[in-house]
Amino acid sequence: MQPFDVIVVGKGNAALCAAIAARDETGARVAMLEAAAVDESGGNSRFAGGMMRFVYNSVEDLRLLADISDDEANNTDWDTNTQDQYYDDLYRVTGFRTDPRLSEIMITQSLQAMVWLRSLGVRFVPNYRAASAVVDGRRRFFGGMAIEVSGGGPGLVQYLDAAALKKGIEIFYETRAVSLIYDGERVLGVQAKHAGKVAEYRAGAVILACGGFEANPEWRTRYLGPGWELAKVRGTRFNMGEGLKMALDIGACPYGNWSGRHVTSWERHAPEFGDLALDHACHRHNYPLSLMINADGKRFVDEGAEFYGYTYAKYGEEVFKQPEQFAWQVFDAKVIPLLRPEYHGKVATRVTAQTLEELAGKMEGVNPEGFLKTVREFNAAVRKDIPFNPGIKDGLCTVGIVPPKSNWAQPLDTPPFEAYHTTAGITFTFGGLRIDPETGQVLDVNLHPIPGLYTAGEMVGGLFYFNYPLGSGLVSGTVFGRIAGVAAGAAARAA
């Protein structure tokens, strides 16, 4: 087989960005190895919502990316996500463990990366759907997430696919990488299996961008702990950890939160793996407006601690820790009109009632007496002197109960009532490889660069610990995918 300059393993956002950067910015001959068939390709990026967290100081920064009219610009509160805000959010949600240099590069290059994506044909639109609300007749964005990719994750992959094909990048589908070709000094390519046969793909550099181990129940049990083999998987069934294993087998240094994971509230009866046909029908992200109730009929988290983008990636784990690994999100008529469309989709396990007593009898697996007691205590604890405002952290809280509800706490007292059955859905795992942040080159256990080996995307360890600010994953994949692509292409071409 004709050798290439760069082999990219994977075909999600990070992999595509790496391949395009290597081809476009260094002139390298690039091939991609994708384990999935064409219709299932795209990795976890196909299952993403398309929201991307980047630095912006005003609506003028947003207008570099999206077509925003003067009327929209002047009559909307667009929020901000300054460098300082981004640093504060990332350090806070990761318990100040995020790698300083990795996070600095991701944050400071985030807007530039978004502009680069737009130059490749990626279309962005205001995120009216999930990050804004109309308050006192004026639209207000919140959570620093004012822009999303048109068409979500599938749209992002489609745009980047088109760019890759236009630039002459060759893609081998149903070709699962199984090992690195390594002579003891440098990586020389990849061995991969297609149609039951193993072939060699030689190259001057290899970029591993094929995700974590979230689809591998054996690895989940090993690294995340007993019981995690039972969790639903939000995304692709192809992320089995092979890229990590290949790198570790030749002495790459593991790094980051290997027992950590991005886990969200998910439809209780969703399929075992993500299903592209369901789009985002299984997401349950409106829990800040709910009471989350376990089998004992008790609350177990502060639902209103933050906007969902700062808690959703860890609250799924809290749901999974409950008896029988489920919870119910309970709403009343005051907030039901604010629920996202997926709550009323065909796949939602939903029960409705005109009284709380009736609702208690319909919530499968829940102790009715415990639930009614919880609601009575909650309603009595809600402050009455603070107005409800879903567009800000309104401080409408409870007093004297544990756990508290810090924002958006309204009495559950207005029929009809609705409850949604949820469990945990794993998106990706946090453990990865240690890299040189400036190049994306993988380091060995002695912290020396491994010649010819680079990584990007979920496989970069050290960015996320315990939790995750919404939209950072796609931006990390873009920033470090581009960095790895340029460095790998340049090194291969110079060899």
Residue ranges of model-derived segments:
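Conserved redox-cofactor binding core of oxidoreductases
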Residues: R101-V198, P217-W219, S265-H269, V375, ...
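Glycine-rich FAD pyrophosphate-binding loop
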Residues: D24-S45
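Beta1/beta-strand and adjacent pyrophosphate-binding region of the FAD-binding site
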Residues: M1-A14, A31
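Rossmann-like flavin
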Residues: A73-G137, Q354-E377
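An anion/pyrophosphate-binding glycine-rich loop and adjacent beta-alpha core
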Residues: M240, L244-G370
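Helix-rich C-terminal "cap"/substrate-channel and partner-interaction subdomain
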Residues: F320-F417, A487, A491
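Glycine-rich loop(s) and the adjacent beta-strand/alpha-helix scaffold that form part
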Residues: H194-K197, Y201-A270, G440, G471-L474, ...
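A glycine-rich dinucleotide-binding beta-alpha-beta segment and adjacent secondary-structure elements
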Residues: S179, G370-N467
